[in-house]
From Swiss-Prot:
Pathway: Protein modification; protein ubiquitination. Its main location: nucleus. Residues 126-406, 555-620 form a coiled coil. This is E3 ubiquitin-protein ligase BRE1. Residues 200-209, 228-250 have a biased composition (Basic and acidic residues). The keyword Hydrolase does not apply. Pfam families: BRE1, zf-C3HC4. Residues 210-227 have a biased composition (Polar residues). A zinc finger (RING-type) spans 648-687.
Length: 700
């Protein structure tokens, strides 16, 4: 039953079952009774806690589902509001769109009619109409089936709950019985161990008797001295067992006779009481018929008096009550209108806040996105510019290298021309054989060498000058390209800045437009709020007027009630006197009937008890003749111990039914209450303090 581990039972030091009860046995019995009561309370608490957890989870699920359904209904109402043409239908949709549960439940029928009205398709296409009608019929059949299943499930649920409650009671009774069966103190007090031992002895005697009979039948053929002695001993045992059986049978017969006589006496008393009650019922029915006829005659007399006296109708209590009810209904309607206006005002204020928040968030998002785009574009421009500068510098270097290669190619061409001339001169010198010509040629060659050297010096100088000039030109060109690059970069940055300025101006204009729109919406909302305030003032004025009118009406009603009460007092006095006399008569009659029934019951009881006492006297007289008088002292002592166990130790009159939680001692309820009333708030046995909250009812 519980999630806690089973508590270990304390070993109780009980006295021997053959001996009479002691004070320690009584204390152990009381403690174990308290323990059983606390354990039962703990089990009930654990079951309640589990039920509470389950119901809480189910409540959360139901609330979540209900919220989803409410949101769906609100969206449906808002959607249907766009199609509505009638003002009442729009008003209904708006009221349902507010999301008030009580309003939705009240206006559910009208809202369902709206849904069926606007849920139908147009009459243009016949196929769609037929499909829609089929679909609606299917939905209606499904709805009917669902309702049937709901009713069946509800009936099954009720049956299951009844079965669960019955099972719970059954298992709690079983647990209680199991706890009582397991307790050693109950066995010790009510002598269950002795009865068990007696039963075991009887079963052993029966088995031994059967075995003896079988062995006697088997050994009847053998004739020995030892067998005869054994048979004699077994015969004595059989005689004793038969005597005990006879005594048990007589006791059982006596108990059954007593029970039968008790039941017969109860049946007789019940039959007599039933007859008396039937007679009383008949008399009451006759009196009821008479009173009803008298009431109908009185009503007829009142109607006739009202027809004769026209002023009598003005004092009609029912009409005044109807007026009061009508005024209260009007007051309730006005309060509902006032609350609806207040809820609308709150909804509009919430919508305004939500709208402003959304606009601010969108504006902030667009601004952040523009800033991010601007930063990314600036990074891209810087990267492109650096790449462009690198490429332009590479191009300038390549152009400078190209000019140097051209100069070298020109020099190589001049050297080739000089080599050709030199080869031609060598050929000419080989062709000429004369010495004169050779000398002239040598002189010419020397002159040519000088001229060549001078030319080569001049060419070298000019070459160096050209190289210097070209290096200066290349440096100037590089600087010019750099300046051009800087100029173009500045122009491009100017273009990008102009583009950024344009985009920012566009965003600024958009933000200004948004601000203007927000201002317009704010103005409209303020106008709506002002209108709502005016409507509120009007409704409050109407409410005040109605309250004043209701006050005047109530004053009139009070005056009329006073006049009616004055007129009714005389009637009430007469009716009270008649009712008192009737009540006294009926009270005396009921007392007479009760006393007669009790007399009969007591006479039957007395006769039954006399017969019972005679039977018990006879049985006791027979038993005392057989048994000795030594067992009487033990019985008296055991009865005294049982009285100390069951009856209160303070008054020794009432049963013990109230335990003190602080110490565990048990007394009767009257003694505990008397001690608390006399401010004696200490236990009489152990002097421990206790209060009214420490008392616990116990059933021993």
């Amino acid at each position: 039953m519980t999630a806690e581990p089973a508590t270990k039972k304390i070993k109780l030091e009980l006295s021997d079952p053959s001996e009479p009860l002691t004070q320690s046995d009584v204390i152990a019995f009381q403690k174990e009774a308290l323990f059983r009561c606390i354990n039962r309370r703990r089990v009930d608490f654990e079951a309640l806690r589990k039920q509470y957890e389950l119901s809480r989870r189910e409540c959360i699920d139901v609330s979540r589902k209900l919220a989803n359904i409410m949101a769906l209904i609100v969206t449906l109402a808002r959607f249907i509001e766009t199609f509505c043409t009638d003002a009442n239908e729009k008003q209904l949709c708006r009221e349902i769109a507010q999301g008030d549960e009580t309003l939705i439940v009240q206006r559910s029928d009208s809202f369902m009619k709206l849904l069926t009205k606007y849920g139908k398709p147009n009459t243009t296409d016949s196929n769609t109409n037929s499909n829609a009608s089929d679909h609606i019929q299917e939905l209606t059949t499904e709805l009917k089936n669902l309702r049937k299943s709901k009713e069946e499930l509800f009936y099954e649920n009720s049956q299951l709950t009844e079965e669960i409650s019955a099972l719970k009671e059954y298992y709690t009774n079983i647990i209680r019985k199991y706890d009582r069966d397991e307790s050693f103190t109950i066995k010790r007090v009510f002598k269950e161990d002795k009865t068990d031992a007696v039963k075991e002895l009887r079963e052993d005697e029966k088995e031994s008797n059967e075995n003896n009979i079988k062995s006697g039948n088997k050994d009847s053929s053998a004739i020995n001295g030892d067998n005869t002695s054994k048979k004699s001993e077994k015969g004595d045992e059989l005689v004793q067992a038969e005597d005990e059986r006879k005594e048990d049978a007589e006791n059982e017969k006596l108990e059954l006779d007593l029970k039968f006589s008790d039941l017969r006496a109860e049946i007789n008393s019940l039959s007599s009481t039933i007859k008396d009650l039937e007679n009383i019922r008949r008399e009451n029915e006759e009196e009821l018929i008479k009173t009803r006829s008298e009431v109908s005659n009185l009503k007829k007399q009142q109607i006739a008096a009202a027809d004769q006296d026209p002023d009598f109708k003005s004092y009609d209590h029912e009409s005044l009550l109807a007026k009061i009810q009508h005024l209260t209904e009007q007051n309730a309607e006005l309060s509902e209108i006032n609350s609806s206006f207040l809820s609308k005002f709150q909804v509009l204020a919430k919508e305004k806040e939500i709208y402003t928040k959304k606009v601010r968030e969108e504006f902030q998002k667009s601004l952040d996105s523009l800033v991010e785009m601007n930063s990314s574009l600036e990074k891209d421009v810087v990267r492109i510019r650096t790449a462009r500068d690198d490429l332009l510098s590479k191009i300038a270097i390549l152009e400078a290298e190209k000019s140097k290669t051209e100069v070298l190619s020109d020099l190589q061409h001049a050297i080739d021309i000089l080599k050709e001339q030199w080869t031609k001169i060598d050929q000419r010198s080989n062709d000429t054989k004369s010495s004169s010509t050779q000398d002239a040629l040598i002189k010419e060659i020397q002159d040519l060498e000088k001229g060549f050297r001078e030319l080569s010096d001049l060419t070298h100088k000019k070459y160096s000058e050209i190289i210097n000039h070209e290096s200066v030109i290349s440096k100037l060109t590089v600087e010019k390209t750099k300046a051009d690059q800087k100029y173009f970069a500045a122009m491009r940055s100017k273009d990008s800045i102009l583009i950024e300025i344009k985009t920012l101006s566009k965003s600024l204009s958009k933000s200004n437009e948004l601000i203007l729109q927000l201002k317009d919406s704010d103005r409209l909302l303020q106008q709506k709020i002002g209108n709502l305030h005016k409507q509120l003032d009007l409704s409050q004025n109407n409410e005040r007027r109605l309250i004043d009118s209701s006050k005047t009406e109530t004053l009139k009603i009070i005056d009329l009630n006073n006049t009616s009460t004055k007129l009714k007092r005389s009637l009430e006095k007469l009716q009270e006197e008649s009712n008192k006399s009737i009540a006294d008569m009926t009270h005396l009659e009921t007392k007479l009937n009760d006393t007669e029934i009790e007399l009969k019951h007591f006479k039957q009881k007395a006769s039954h008890l006399e017969s019972k006492c005679e039977k018990l006297h006879d049985t006791l007289f027979r038993g005392n003749n057989k048994n000795k008088g030594s067992s009487d002292e033990a019985l008296v002592e055991e009865l005294a111990n049982f009285r100390t166990l069951v009856y209160c130790s303070l008054c020794s009159k009432n049963w013990k039914n109230m335990a003190i939680k602080t110490c565990g001692h048990v007394f009767c309820e009257n003694c505990c209450k008397e001690r608390l009333a006399a401010r004696m708030r200490k236990c009489p046995t152990c002097n421990k303090a206790f209060s009214s909250n420490d008392l616990l009812t116990v059933h021993l």
